[in-house]
């Protein structure tokens, strides 16, 4: 008889994905994260070319950090520090 192979469970499949994404973290784990709505250069690191906020799974931020980032980006857009949409999409 052939030995039975283990099925890939969802939990096993996600382990390799989470390990790969952990290295993509744009902010150091030890660094205290503070997003200032006036810091245009720092906010633009987390916005793609269409003007959308990059999701957590790509940036590597925690839920709390992503929430602070989103709030800062939205407030900066409201105050016209950064544009809502990129120029080529207007």
Curated annotation (Swiss-Prot):
Keywords: Ribonucleoprotein, Ribosomal protein, RNA-binding, rRNA-binding
Biased composition (Polar residues): 9-21
Keyword Glycoprotein attached: no
Cellular component per GO, a single term: ribonucleoprotein complex
Region described as Disordered: 1-23
Domain of life: Bacteria
Gene Ontology MF, one: small ribosomal subunit rRNA binding
One GO process term, biological-process aspect: translation
Family of the protein in this entry: Belongs to the bacterial ribosomal protein bS18 family.
Record-linked NCBIfam families: S18
Biological role: Binds as a heterodimer with protein bS6 to the central domain of the 16S rRNA, where it helps stabilize the platform of the 30S subunit.
Subunit structure: Part of the 30S ribosomal subunit. Forms a tight heterodimer with protein bS6.
Protein name stated in the entry: Small ribosomal subunit protein bS18
Gene source species: Chlorobium luteolum (strain DSM 273 / BCRC 81028 / 2530) (Pelodictyon luteolum)
Gene name for this UniProt entry: rpsR
